[in-house]
């Protein structure tokens, strides 16, 4: 299954010079969506994953069905103020300013083997913050898994420099 061919590219969105990789075309295709979930899940079947953590919001779309396929729980990694119970959070830098992600304090137990999932890795800042938060909570990030890697932006290298393993189903050159 050629996942990459099912992803639409939109030039100059949301800003001039950006090539936006739109996974909605993949998500609406039942064959493509099923293949995506099955390909990611099959990689981790033998890795003794305890939880799948998905980064808001498209990481939820991919992460929850992967967790289902693996027979494990799903942990949403959300933006500040979006979770109803007590949370633990971590700040991270954006191009212009900063943001914060949070996880419920009871979502990750000490020793949990966690698969971190999102749709795309660009700079790696959000994934780095999420992995750091999981680690602070006592979890071990087994791997960071993405549908798309934009290697020219450097996110994979950033995560690997932090000692994290990274997997992506496909790559797109440029930004």
Curated annotation (Swiss-Prot):
Pathway: Purine metabolism; AMP biosynthesis via salvage pathway; AMP from adenine: step 1/1. The keyword Glycosyltransferase applies. Keywords: Cytoplasm, Glycosyltransferase, Purine salvage, Transferase. Gene3D superfamilies: 3.40.50.2020. It comes from the Bacteria. The keyword Cytoplasm applies. Its main location: cytoplasm. It is an enzyme of class 2 (transferase). This is Adenine phosphoribosyltransferase. It comes from Nitrosospira multiformis (strain ATCC 25196 / NCIMB 11849 / C 71). The gene is apt.
